[in-house]
C-alpha cells in the first residue's frame, strides 16, 4: 500500500501581535497529528504563514511609524521562540504578502470570473467623515442584526457566529473616531455563493464526512431560510463581498485600480502559497504535487472561523478548478481554571513565552493539552491543579519513573544488557503490543485524550508488575540474578513501547529515550518487535522534572500594575531571561559558602533512607510527614517542607538521603528526627522547584554517603 501523501495547515495568525495560548494549542494539536502520520510512514507537508493584510494592520503600522511590510516583518521575526519552544515543527512558515500569494489569489479570482461567479454591484458603504476613508469591516461596530449583541464587528458576530454586511449592523459607529459613519456608493465585487452550482456542491461537500458531525450539523443550518435585518426572509446562502476600497493593505484586484481583495479571500490562499514556496525551495513542482489524486488536504482551525473554511474556501477552490479540502478539523476554545475567560489583569492569562521563561517544560503543556483534546470541537479548560496532578502523578510518576526503576540495575549488574522477560513479563509485553492499533486509531481521529488515557492504563499495569517483582529487593537477595534481569528487562521493553505510544506528544523526551535505549527513531511499525535479549542500553539520565506549585503561581501572578498597559510577551520573556542570567553569577543563585575542613564535614552523618510511608500534615500546606528506614531496626519520623513538589504516594518506596545525626527537633506537629536532603535554587521566585535527592539503584537503607 503506497504511503499517504498529506498537506496539513493550521489557521493563519493575524500578524498584528504575538502568538497567544489559543494559537499554541492549535499548533500543538496539529503537530501531534503530523508527527503521528510520519510515524505511520506518511509523507506530510505541514505549513503555516502569517495573515498580513487588511486595514487593521495598515492602521497599526501607521501608529507605529512603520510601513505595513516592516510592521508584519517585525511580528514574523518573533514567531520562532514560540514554535521552537513548544517543539512545533512546521516545514515552512510564510506570509500572505509573499509573491506566491499575490499570484495564486489573482489566478483564483480570474478562474472564478471565468466560471461566471463574480458579479459587480454598486453598494452603499460606510465612510468615516472624520478620517476621510471607507471603513473596513473590523472598524465598524454596532448591534448584531441576528442576536442583537452589542459592540460586534462589521463582518461577523463573535457572539452567535453570524456573517453579514457592515450595513446590516444596527446603530453602527466608527471604531477609529467614534463618529457615526455615512453611506457612500462604491462598486464592489461579489462571489456568488448563492449560485445553484455553489449551493449544490456545498450541500454535498459539507455532509459527506469531511467535517465532524457536530460541525456538519451546524453548517447545515446555514442553507436554510435566513432572516434579514429588515425582517424579511431570504432562502439559502448569501453572496460574499470580496473587495475593499483604497486605502487598503492587500492584493490589488486585477483590472480594478483602487480595489483590493478582502483579507478573507487571500488569507486561506496563503495555505497554498506557503506550500508552493516550500516545494519550490526543494526544487519540486507545485502543480504536479497538487494534481496528485492521492494527495489529502487537511486544515486545523478553531470554531470561530468555520464559516470561511466550510463555505467560502471550498467553493473558491472547487469553481476555480482546484482540489477541495479532504478534512477540516475544528477545535474549541481554551479557558483557564474552571472556565474563566483569559485576562492578564485578573491573573487568568496564560502567556506562552512567560511559561517558557519560568523554566516550565514545554512537554508538560503538550501532554496536558493532549490529555484534554478529543477530536470534537468542545472547549477545554486549563486547570492549574489538574495540570500539576496530571504531569507529576501520571506523566512522571507513572510513565517516566518506570525506566529509573530498572535501568540502574541493568547497567550496574549486567553491563546494560537485556535478558529475556519472565512468563508474566512476556504476557505483559504482549498486552502492551496488542494496544498499538487502538492507540494509533485514536491518534488518527485526533482523540489524543484517548491515546494518552490508554497509554497510562498500560503504564499502570507495568507499575503493578514492578511493584510485584520488587527489583530493589531482588538485587539484595542471593541467587536472584536471573529474576532481577528478567524483571528489569520487562520494564525497559515496556518503557520503549510506552515511549513509542507517547512520541507524537513528547518528541523531545522520546528522542532522549531513543538515545538511552540505543535505538533508531521509533515508529508504529516497531510496536510488534522487542529490543531482544543481549541488546545493550546506555546509562540512564534523568528525563523530566516535576511541576512546582511556585511555577504555576508565578505563571498566573496578577501584574503589579494591572491597569497599566501590559508589556509584550517577548519583552516579558526577555526580562525573565535577563533575571535568570543575572542569577547565574552565583551558582544555583547563591554564592559558595566559606570553606570548611574535612573534620567539619565528618561531623555530618549522611545516610541512605527508604521512605516507608509519607502523609500530609494536617494544618500545614508545606510539610509532609515521612517515615524513614535508615537500617537501624526502627523507623524515624521526619518532617520535610516539600509538599508543594510531591504527592505523598509518589515518594513511598523511594530511596533518599538524610542527615541522620541531626539533633531531634520538637515541632508543632511532632518531633522531627533528621533532615531529608533536597535541592532548590537560591532565587525561588525566578527558579521555583524542590528536588529531593534520589540515589542510584543499588544503594540500600543505612549506607553512608561519603
UniProtKB/Swiss-Prot annotation:
* Limits of the tRNA-binding domain: 600-706
Tell whether Zinc is among the UniProt keywords. yes
Q: What is its EC number?
A: 6.1.1.10
Single GO BP term: methionyl-tRNA aminoacylation
Q: Where in the cell is it found?
A: Cytoplasm
Q: Where does ATP bind?
A: 344
Q: Cross-referenced Gene3D superfamilies, in alphabetical order?
A: HUPs, Isoleucyl-tRNA Synthetase, Domain 1, Methionyl-tRNA synthetase, Zn-domain, Nucleic acid-binding proteins
**What is the similarity comment for this entry?**
Belongs to the class-I aminoacyl-tRNA synthetase family. MetG type 1 subfamily.
Instruction: State the oligomer form and interacting partners.
Output: Homodimer.
What HAMAP family is this protein classified in?
Answer: Met_tRNA_synth_type1 (MF_00098)
The name of this protein is Methionine--tRNA ligase
Protein source organism:
Paracidovorax citrulli (strain AAC00-1) (Acidovorax citrulli)
Q: What is the lineage of its organism?
A: Bacteria, Pseudomonadati, Pseudomonadota, Betaproteobacteria, Burkholderiales
Q: Which gene encodes it?
A: metG
